[in-house]
């Protein structure tokens, strides 16, 4: 998954490695294949191949296969559900 930190983006890899880039998360989003990646929050993009489950609480939380949990913003909840429905 990817996480934004100001003007930097951290790319989190399967093996717990992290790479930091000076590209914004928006710039990277434009380069990613749309059928594998979805933006779930202003600060997060996930690879749906590693989506383990969705937890509904007050909002939605995605849990990835490495047990990472990320909040889904209210504005992105419907996008996520539609994306998964169309897979």
Give, region by region, the residue ranges found by the protein language model.
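Conserved binding/recognition cores within well-folded domains
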Residues: 1-65
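A short macromolecule-binding patch
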Residues: 19-23, 70-75
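Alpha-helix boundary/capping detector
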Residues: 54-58, 71-72, 77
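Eukaryotic intrinsically disordered, low-complexity regulatory linkers and tails enriched in Ser/Thr/Pro
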Residues: 64-66, 74, 78-87
């Amino acid at each position: 998954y990817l996480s934004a930190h100001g003007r930097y983006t951290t790319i989190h890899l399967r093996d717990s490695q992290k790479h930091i880039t000076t590209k914004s998360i928006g710039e990277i989003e434009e380069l990613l294949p749309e059928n594998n990646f979805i933006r779930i929050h202003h600060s997060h993009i996930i690879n749906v191949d590693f989506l383990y489950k969705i937890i509904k609480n007050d909002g939605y939380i995605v849990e990835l296969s490495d047990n990472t949990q990320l909040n889904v913003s209210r504005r992105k909840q419907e996008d996520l559900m539609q994306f998964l429905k169309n897979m």
